[in-house]
């Protein structure tokens, strides 16, 4: 069963990277503090953009940033689809807005959006979008991801294990931290 063992080891590495990604996002969220709730007035796309613009204005005012300073926005991966389907409904045209259309809207607001996995996942078998859309917003360069040397070992054999025909198939570790810069 070498193919099965290889597939499982590969999937273990992917799962490990997802867990690290979740920890990095959680560290950023913790550093940013408690989120501000925004009472929406209507459609998902306009409410989301308005909430982010208000948050962005507050950040620009607090740090006295240029009005054209790029702000980083982190949202769950499914947020793009929420925005696209809402724009489709609002525009009343027969074509679905593209990823570029959504990016252009945020680009016009000087926001660089990252759609991420491993944070605020959709419940299994969802039939409706969540009622709230969490977002992290901060000036570009506010956080640095720190890493240390990585050790990956595979197929490690030792004398005691050889006697009973076992080996270490996979061992990995990674040192990761998030440092706030401002």
Where are these regions (language model features)?
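Extended, compositionally biased alpha-helical segments that mediate assembly or anchoring
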Residues: 116-182
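Phenylalanine-focused residue identity feature
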Residues: 16, 38, 88, 106, ...
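A generic structural motif
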Residues: 101-121
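Intrinsically disordered or highly flexible coil/loop and linker segments, enriched in small
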Residues: 18-25, 65, 115, 119
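Extended, solvent-exposed, turn-rich assembly/linker loops in the middle of proteins
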Residues: 36-107
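Alpha-helix capping and helix-coil boundary motifs
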Residues: 4, 44, 94-102, 121-122, ...
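Long, contiguous amphipathic alpha-helices that act as assembly "spine/axial" helices in icosahedral shell
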Residues: 1-42, 170
